[in-house]
Amino acid sequence: MKKIRQIKSYPVIPRSAEDPANQKGNLKRAQVELKKRFERINKAMKQLVKDQEQYQRVASANKMAFWWPLDSNGERINEVVVNKAYYSYDISTERYDSINSFIEHLLYNELLESLTGQRPNNWFYQSYLSSAYNDAIRDTIQSSKNMAEPSVVGDEIAMMIRQLDADAFNPQQVNALSLVYSRVFNEMKGLTDSMKVDLSETLTRGMASGLGIREITQDVAKRVGVGFSRAQRISRTEILGAYRTAQRDKTRQINEDIYSDSPFVQKQLWFSALAMTSRPHHVAKHGQIYSMQEVEEFYSENGNSINCLCSQSPILVNRKTGEAVMKDLIKKMRQQKDAWRAGVGR
């Protein structure tokens, strides 16, 4: 698939068609950190289950279970006798509360870094969100500078755009990023509370059912794995969500502060993630131009934001006609999309 070459008057062109927001490295670092934390959770839960061995005793009479495998006609093949050991556990209300307390402390410490459930100032996940957010601010400013040619937008606007600084302190951006932190922390807290109930029920139900330590350990490990999958999904969704949110916020600010009385306005050029895992209706948007409201509505519906690797970039358009100033870029992107579809048969 042919890549689109970066040209001075174009917005920032993705280096990888599969990773248009250039967040692959950031995502990987976040995934590695989450994996380490869930490995510690799994190890601690395994030890918690093993600790229940001291409260375990084999039932006085093992239960005998008889079953007969049948063929496709319902006829018995032969008799199989299964002799399975059942256990009973001495578990008091205090012991039950102790198990719940241990699980809550473990999960809150590893995933929230807070025993109160309140977001700490230096929550570990903030670094990945801030990295994505700040990348988007820089990309948006650079795209705006690339497109603001004096011969097109005029000397005054071109000069104002050139003065934009991604590193300048901006209280609006600080507040917006804080809101991103809070939203994602609440999502992770929801996952943590759900896991707390799930792991506690899996452990205590296994004990009540008379299962052995090995079986309970396996069941608990499966539930930890489910939690890890959910955490990964939150990670992918929210890091890219932070990038897209920052890009829209900065584009909107530039429109209001600089382009408000201009015959031009910056809209949203859609860069789809041209990857096998991308949903067809996401790929279809590659090279299309949308308003920021249209983009926000799309991501608010039908789980479209979940695991989405697409990104958008500001694109300079004529306010009256809605046509892009860089028509050749739009043409190249649509050709790129058609070539990718032909190559993968979609």
Model regions: which residues?
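N-terminal leader/targeting and assembly helices and adjacent pre-domain segments
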Residues: M1-R223, R319-R346
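Acidic, glycine-rich two-metal-ion catalytic cores of nucleic acid-processing enzymes
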Residues: G225-V226, R230-K331
